[in-house]
């Protein structure tokens, strides 16, 4: 049962990472369209879903300092 739980957690983390990457992509698209607030929200959501996603953190920091 512990193995099943560990596998479920692993699959969930993999799924959340995929979702976070999608939010980073949307953030980049918003940046390219000069939609700063939408980009910020997308990067924040990516970090919420997968806190160790460094690209979203870098992009968010850069946007917040503009």
Segments (PLM) and residue ranges:
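Conserved structural position within tetratricopeptide repeats
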Residues: 14, 47-48, 65
């Amino acid at each position: 049962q512990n193995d099943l739980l560990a596998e479920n957690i692993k699959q969930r983390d993999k799924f959340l990472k995929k979702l976070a990457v999608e939010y980073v992509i949307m953030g980049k698209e918003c940046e390219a369209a000069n939609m700063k607030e939408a980009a910020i929200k997308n990067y924040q959501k990516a970090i919420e879903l997968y806190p160790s996603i460094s690209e979203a953190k870098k992009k968010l920091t850069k946007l917040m300092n503009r």
